[in-house]
Amino acid sequence: MAPSTVAVELLSPKEKNRLRKPVVEKMRRDRINSSIEQLKLLLEQEFARHQPNSKLEKADILEMAVSYLKHSKAFVAAAGPKSLHQDYSEGYSWCLQEAVQFLTLHAASDTQMKLLYHFQRPPAAPAAPAKEPKAPGAAPPPALSAKATAAAAAAHQPACGLWRPW
């Protein structure tokens, strides 16, 4: 039996807190140092541009991170707020590109062709709040590859609709 285990069990709560405090403080400092090191790695190019051959102190790293975040925030604000429709269109386009890329990687099947044909149609716009003006038209989906377009057109059968579980 280790003597330190017995000694800790016999200590009062106040004495346990006194012993635990330096350990907790060291863990806190380690977390801070780790986070500062991660910031340094993330902003490495920014540091090289502003201070090429200097040893960076923790304060320098934090100042540079704050400066970078302020600049990023100002850049986003200058770009202007996005509308709900714009967000929806961008998300739809990204999802469409991912789905088409996945579908064209595998051997063609009837269901795959129907999906590709379905993706050719423009997306339905989301319901916009009353205070936000609606865009005049939905952004068309990005052009599909020639292979996907040809396969979708060949597989389309007007008499048979696409099955949906809803």
From Swiss-Prot:
Residue window of motif WRPW motif: 163-166
GO cellular component: a single term: chromatin
Top-rank taxon: Eukaryota
One GO BP: oligodendrocyte development
Keywords linked to the UniProt accession: Developmental protein, Differentiation, DNA-binding, Neurogenesis, Nucleus, Repressor, Transcription, Transcription regulation
Orange domain sequence ranges: 88-119
Subcellular localization: Nucleus
Tissue expression profile of the protein: Expressed in fetal heart and brain tumors.
Subunit details: Transcription repression requires formation of a complex with a corepressor protein of the Groucho/TLE family.
Domains: entry comment: Has a particular type of basic domain (presence of a helix-interrupting proline) that binds to the N-box (CACNAG), rather than the canonical E-box (CANNTG).
UniProt-recorded name of the protein: Transcription factor HES-5
Organism classification: Eukaryota, Metazoa, Chordata, Craniata, Vertebrata
Gene expressing this chain: HES5
